[in-house]
Design a protein with these regions (language model features):
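Extended acidic/polar, glycine-enriched regions
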Residues: 1-6
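Substrate-binding/active-site clefts of carbohydrate-active enzymes
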Residues: 11, 16-23, 28, 32-182
């Protein structure tokens, strides 16, 4: 399928000295980017950050923003977990959003889904034992975190988590439905 290269070093961050707000006593705003503004993009959401600050919000928790099939969705059926959804503004849009949040004193947490893949467009099983039938979730076979071949599967998800923190300056991750891991 289609793919592209992205140079993370080309983006010029302004938040080099950012300090994440403490999570103790935090006031989170869970944001579905596609419905937060009429534009449904990172850039449109930047225009409303002052409003969140005025509400007393300390951390913005983004619902999943990875690529998913179709034009509308909650993001919980992601299939390209390393790709920021282009409809929202792609990698640069997310970086501008995080940079702007930090400029407003807002931390950014990202909701990640590591317990299942979306039902359409998931090709990970063609490349390795990403799923196991030993345990099923409400969405189908569970992700293989414990069976044969699971070392590389775990590395895939660890690399993904590190990418969000390192390359997108996330202040934390919220793991969806951890009770479904095993």
């Amino acid at each position: 399928g289609p793919s592209r290269l992205y140079d993370h070093a080309a983006f010029k961050w302004n938040d080099n000295r950012r300090q994440s707000p403490p999570l103790s006593g935090a006031i989170l705003y869970e944001m579905h980017l596609g419905t937060f503004t009429s534009g449904g993009t990172f850039d449109a959401a930047i225009e409303r950050l002052e409003y969140l600050s005025e509400l007393g919000v300390t951390n913005d928790e983004l619902m999943p923003v990875v690529e998913f099939p179709g034009k509308h969705g909650w993001g919980y059926d992601g299939v390209a977990l390393f790709a920021v959804n282009d409809l929202y503004g792609g990698p640069d849009g997310l970086k501008r959003f995080v940079d702007a949040c930090h400029a407003h004193g807002l931390g950014v947490l990202m909701d990640v889904v590591y317990n299942h893949f979306g039902p359409v467009g998931n090709y990970t099983t063609k490349f390795g034992p990403y799923l196991t039938g030993r345990h099923c979730t409400p969405w189908g076979d569970a992700v293989n975190f414990e069976d044969s071949g699971s070392d590389e599967v775990r590395r895939f998800f660890c690399d993904n988590a590190l990418m969000w923190m390192r390359d997108y300056h996330m202040d934390g991750l919220r793991l969806d439905a951890v009770h479904e891991f095993m």
